[in-house]
Amino acid sequence: MKTRSKKTKTENNQEKSKEKNKFDQLPLDLEIEIFRRLPLKSVARFLTLSKSCAATIRSPSFITSFRSPQPCTLIASAPIFNCLHPFKPRVLVDHKLSFFSSSSSSSSSTSFLSRLTCPSSPYPRHMEYYCHYVNGLISVGYGREQIVTNPSTGRFITLPSVRTKRRLVKSFFGYDPASDQYKVLCMTERLYGHQEDPSSQHQVFTLGVKKPWKMLDRTTIPDHRPWTNGVCIDGVVYYIAKTGQGMSQLSLMRYDLRDDNLNVFISLPEEIRTPSLYSDTLLNYEGKLAIAIPVTSYIFDVWVMDQDGEKHEWLKKITFNIEPWQSSFDDIRIKGTTLTGEFIFAPMNNYCDDEFYVFHYKSQQE
């Protein structure tokens, strides 16, 4: 009489461990190639399979492996109030942000990624959502509430509330590739204060470190009031702010993630110091800091900072005219750039409920 052998629970666990070890022994480049061939939803499931899989998916090598000659553009879409003026608060109607990816090589290749429900507030018209994209993640700030999300997988984390009693909180987001760290920089302003009042209560939260918000030394930070969006390049966050006596000057601020140093980097020259500066004016153009200035609604000057020498200079790199688009859209803004040097445009106001438009423009100027 034959008897069927039964595997013990220990033996089953040992076999599963062996299978897992086989995957762990694969070369990193092969693991990355395997994950790259999977749908995004499958990649998201692997985040919870093992620490090894999660480490590979979150590694800079895996993130940068998606950089191709035809990269995708990340699009964040949401219905907002007060969208007719660039300096009015952008307040979400239903507290939802939808993320899409789009390829510049095909107008029909836009695909839905995920949707994020943001926190509500009893004072919705007094606060603005601040969104910043850095190295695969998006930081969304709304008053004291801060969220960091991965739009590709839909996963997100809610940070501890910013340490302040004020309702008006401005935020910036940065990534340091040297230490592989993400940080959120926040500062507060008085809700009904004057435009001459500087920001205060500057504090930093480091992702992945179980520590509270870190308050920066106020005595080391010059008086300033943020005026534009922020751009992170090589572990440094830049943004334009009002500085000087009565906040009458415009300067470029520099926040270094490595040592949490926040200071004035350089003053803006007269040619750039213009009322036409708006919230999305800073760009990362081919790895260099750039400023896009609308001469009119359809003519733009792009200035690029030259940091190669000891003297930092702003060079007028490109001037281009997109007036042929005037018949289709009332007002267009530069919203970003691609890794291949294309400029990304979008209408300031989208009057169609079920469609939105994004344009890629490749300048032929040197």
From Swiss-Prot:
Positions of the UniProt region annotated as Disordered: 1-20
Matches recorded under Pfam families: F-box, FBA_3
Biased composition, class Basic and acidic residues, residue ranges: 8-20
Occurrences of domain F-box (ranges): 20-66
NCBIfam families: F_box_assoc_1 (TIGR01640)
PANTHER family associated with the record: BNAA05G37150D PROTEIN-RELATED (PTHR31111), F-BOX DOMAIN-CONTAINING PROTEIN (PTHR31111:SF67)
Protein name: Putative F-box protein At1g26515
Top-level taxonomy: Eukaryota, Viridiplantae, Streptophyta, Embryophyta, Tracheophyta
